[in-house]
Amino acid sequence: MASMSTVFPKPTSFISQPLTKSHKSDSVTTSISFPSNSKTRSLRTISVRAGLIEPDGGKLVDLVVPEPRRREKKHEAADLPRVRLTAIDLQWMHVLSEGWASPLRGFMRESEFLQTLHFNLLNLDDGSVVNMSVPIVLAIDDQQKALIGESKRVSLVDSDDNPIAILNDIEIYKHPKEERIARTWGTTAPGLPYVEEAITNAGDWLIGGDLEVLEPVKYNDGLDRFRLSPFELRKELEKRGADAVFAFQLRNPVHNGHALLMTDTRRRLLEMGYKNPILLLHPLGGFTKADDVPLSWRMKQHEKVLEDGVLDPETTVVSIFPSPMLYAGPTEVQWHAKARINAGANFYIVGRDPAGMGHPVEKRDLYDADHGKKVLSMAPGLERLNILPFRVAAYDKTQGKMAFFDPSRAQDFLFISGTKMRALAKNRENPPDGFMCPGGWKVLVDYYDSLTLTGNTKLPEKIPV
């Protein structure tokens, strides 16, 4: 069977607007119209040629030092002032180094930070703009700032004090934590997972500059073979002859409703005239909140789904997206979409309440469930990307399988929430037949069994540095 590092599919659904094929050549042009509430744009139409689209800025950024120069750069790094990276800092460095944030070339300087925070974009030298909705910044404290002094370069080191990167032509500026939190999350309520992990106790200064990463980032956790860079993904997609790439991000186990959505999306793309649409199944691999299923268990579950034939390995590429999860709703989902452009995707699948979470204080969702997909259809810098909102899938009791929800017979459908799914797995109970493949469900049960054995109700996964 095909290796899991080169295959996979997941949930999707399709827009109701017509998609049209150009008959002038073998290439396909999609035209998708989105209604907008903007007074200046009552309708938005996107046209994208078949195949892989250009990365933002026209060229993928690669910030890893070429191998012949690594020894020299390591010697340079040894003599520079040092900034120690946290696990989340390392994940952002990984993101930057491989070009997921192209054309960004390092941790943000103040002008880039302000453009991102206030406008959700970056202005390029040629007058064009690219989407950039979340700040990618590095915090330092007063002591680190003093040690850096007048130096224009610093060495970034891991938890063992080993140099792993150099930051050049640096700029140090104030870290406006409250404003950053308010503008990114839309609230400063206590209990935001990423804020508590990475911002609240971070330094009061930010340091930006051009990044040189001394070696490719490896986690040595048995999953590195799934961590394909944008360059590697594009190479794999071209090798497969993809004429359309539809990306789906997830941080949860795959059930048969997801598979239905994914296969339906591919069917619709084939009906449009595409000959070989490929799914990029792209689970998030960075920081997640404590009650999410850890990455290693999610990847085991995804593999079983593939082995059980729920997903087609020939038309799916499975890879890990190294970004941390912010749970910043419509703001963050723009980042998720933008990064997939750099990986070659021209279609992005978006579901209900993408990148959302429950309000940390009040008993409600933090974000409107429909705002994510609406924002993506209007966001500056994402015009080249076709947005595919989910169709709602639920368990059809009359058919004994996952199916698209039919409101005319709502009584026939059962919605199995993530909370319900976790409760069933924790209690070693089986879901209805047809909800999830048996192999995938067993992985989920085994995960919750492992928590019971350790005496924990939840065992957060340590992120290696």
Curated annotation (Swiss-Prot):
GO CC terms in record: chloroplast; chloroplast stroma
Keyword Nucleotidyltransferase: yes
Catalyses which reaction(s): sulfate + ATP + H(+) = adenosine 5'-phosphosulfate + diphosphate
Domain of life of the native organism: Eukaryota
Pathway it works in: Sulfur metabolism; hydrogen sulfide biosynthesis; sulfite from sulfate: step 1/3
GO biological process: cellular response to sulfate starvation; hydrogen sulfide biosynthetic process; protein trimerization; sulfate assimilation
Subcellular location: Plastid, Chloroplast stroma
Any GO MF annotation of the entry: sulfate adenylyltransferase (ATP) activity
Reported induction: Accumulates in roots during S starvation, but decreased after SO(4) anion restoration (at protein level). Repressed locally and systemically by phloem-translocated glutathione (GSH) (at protein level).
Keyword set, alphabetical order: ATP-binding, Chloroplast, Nucleotide-binding, Nucleotidyltransferase, Plastid, Transferase, Transit peptide
Boundaries of the annotated transit peptide in chain numbering: 1-49
Annotated EC: 2.7.7.4
CDD domains: ATPS
Subunit structure: Homotetramer.
Family: Belongs to the sulfate adenylyltransferase family.
Protein name in the entry: ATP-sulfurylase 3, chloroplastic
Organism: Arabidopsis thaliana
